[in-house]
Amino acid sequence: MSDSVDIEEKPPAPPLRMNSNNRDSSALNHCSKPLPMAPEEKNKKARLRSIFPGGGDKTNKKKEKERPEISLPSDFEHTIHVGFDAVTGEFTPDLCGSQMGTGKLPEGIPEQWARLLQTSNITKLEQKKNPQAVLDVLKFYDSKETVNNQKYMSFTSGDKSAHGYIAAHSLNAKTASEPPLAPPVSEEEDEEEEEEEDDNEPPPVIAPRPEHTKSIYTRSVIEPVALTAPAKEASTSPVTPQPENSNSSTSTLYRNTDRQRKKSKMTDEEILEKLRSIVSVGDPKKKYTRFEKIGQGASGTVYTAIDIATGQEVAIKQMNLQQQPKKELIINEILVMRENKNPNIVNYLDSYLVGDELWVVMEYLAGGSLTDVVTETCMDEGQIAAVCRECLQALDFLHSNQVIHRDIKSDNILLGMDGSVKLTDFGFCAQITPEQSKRSTMVGTPYWMAPEVVTRKAYGPKVDIWSLGIMAIEMVEGEPPYLNENPLRALYLIATNGTPELQNPERLSAIFRDFLNRCLEMDVDRRGSAKELLQHPFLKIAKPLSSLTPLIIAAKEAIKNSSR
């Protein structure tokens, strides 16, 4: 057969998206909440003398060293009383708040909240329609507990083929900076702002997603901001806070969570002891060969290597434990991955302690993340159905083992060159127990968050189903809903709008639209479970996974060409 005939028989290249996914996102400057005033020097000394009566005596030095260190106050709660004037459409001081009779003026909306609101693009009509939702998102957005999540491995290598893998795959060691929205720590840990400077290396060739699409974490709120009506104005109408599904058991849950968090503090030695009980004994350099560096991050390095015994290509993450601010998270993630192996999950293979470094061996998927395919190519319904089916199989497995992933999005779906689809990044996963069947911590990535997470209500495994529905829209439109909105307004829209509207719903089949509606049902009880959705007719039109391979290759080519 001639070469010309071969050329004619080649299938057409997969369609590419015309719009670029490289968007600028300007970080918002947030005013930090003021620190509590330091006690007066005189009172401070008197208090110290009462605690350490022999403080100046040298003979007591040994005893002083043995005494426990008195820590600074923590977990300050600054209660803000805000009302809403339905006539003027303005947030006002709460004139009947707890400060009346104290001689202090009521606070009203804090100045930094007012500034955020002015630049949020939330209209006056929207504020008037649902003022409590506005306060909810302001409270979250300005929370001192909100910390930015720079994924553990940020790609800085010249090997563009590794970009999706490194960008998507993390083992909970997060770096901190301060962009518009941001994240993670552990639900079992006190949140601290980690201030690590970014590596002074050249930026990656491929522009990353906007900062505000990164995962976020904020801790549970025991008493959310309550919206009260001003009492002295006849023109104002009371606004009742949205129900939080709170009862005595929920209050107990919050208190128990705080207690567990305090108890969970581990010393470095305890962490090392725990790691020694988890990792394998031996020298990994004798088990693996052909190490090739594919990624470098502030907290460690990622290599590919070959298992000498099996010939399997693996990814090895080498982390310096001294540089990990939240070592407990690493233990948690390893334990979850080790106990939950599945064909649709990027599986944990092994781990080793090598000097001061922890080496974690994982499956390696050379196809990169689904994000590359979503942003660079156009997927048809059969291909989307195939991806959804594989993800639902992973979620059904996790949910049946009482694990919520809490950060489902295209960045956390890795692809093999054969079209295999696997879920990764268990840094935010939560274990459900009979004592704690619901969670309330705001975790995930804003644009993929379920409404019940944004409003900080108790939630369960179905938050993953909502995020899967948003990811399905991502596969259709190349981005999640509200991505071009101001992040604060996006949170408001998620909390109030319900199921997001599609740009061109008429282009989708009826069964696909029904599948999306089942995933994106506001009523959690009516939202489909992973097990139920695996029986949905939409999944019956799924194409073979091998149909994803041309898209993966096309995405890699598009990325390669854009970097020239």
Curated annotation (Swiss-Prot):
Gene3D superfamilies: CRIB domain, Phosphorylase Kinase, domain 1, Transferase(Phosphotransferase) domain 1
EC annotation from Swiss-Prot or TrEMBL: 2.7.11.1
Chain intervals with Polar residues compositional bias: 18-29, 234-255
Subcellular location: Cytoplasm
InterPro entries reported in the protein's UniProt record: CRIB_dom, CRIB_dom_sf, Kinase-like_dom_sf, PAK3-like, PAK_BD, Prot_kinase_dom, Protein_kinase_ATP_BS, Ser/Thr_kinase_AS
CRIB domain sequence ranges: 70-83
Class of enzymatic activity (EC top level): transferase
Pfam families in alphabetical order: PBD, Pkinase
UniProt feature, compositional bias: Acidic residues: 186-201
Taxonomic superkingdom: Eukaryota
Region called Disordered, residue ranges: 1-70, 172-216, 229-267
Expression induction: Up-regulated by the proneural transcription factors Neurog2, Neurod1 and Ebf3. Down-regulated by the Notch pathway.
Residue segments, region Autoregulatory region: 65-150
Free-text disruption phenotype from the record: Morpholino knockdown of the protein causes inhibition of neuronal differentiation and an accumulation of neuronal progenitor cells in the anterior neural plate.
GO terms of biological process kind: anterior neural plate formation; cell differentiation; cell migration; cellular response to starvation; cement gland development; intracellular signal transduction; negative regulation of neuroblast proliferation; neural plate formation
Start and end residues of each stretch annotated as Linker: 84-287
Keywords assigned by UniProt, alphabetized: ATP-binding, Cell cycle, Cytoplasm, Developmental protein, Differentiation, Growth arrest, Kinase, Magnesium, Metal-binding, Nucleotide-binding, Serine/threonine-protein kinase, Transferase
Molecular-function annotations in GO: ATP binding; metal ion binding; protein serine kinase activity; protein serine/threonine kinase activity
PROSITE patterns given in the database record: CRIB, PROTEIN_KINASE_ATP, PROTEIN_KINASE_DOM, PROTEIN_KINASE_ST
Catalyses which reaction(s): L-seryl-[protein] + ATP = O-phospho-L-seryl-[protein] + ADP + H(+); L-threonyl-[protein] + ATP = O-phospho-L-threonyl-[protein] + ADP + H(+)
Binding site for ATP: I294, G295, Q296, G297, A298, S299, G300, T301, V302, K317
Classification via PANTHER family: SERINE/THREONINE-PROTEIN KINASE SAMKA-RELATED-RELATED, SERINE_THREONINE-PROTEIN KINASE PAK 3
Protein family (similarity comment): Belongs to the protein kinase superfamily. STE Ser/Thr protein kinase family. STE20 subfamily.
Protein name as it appears in the record: Serine/threonine-protein kinase PAK 3
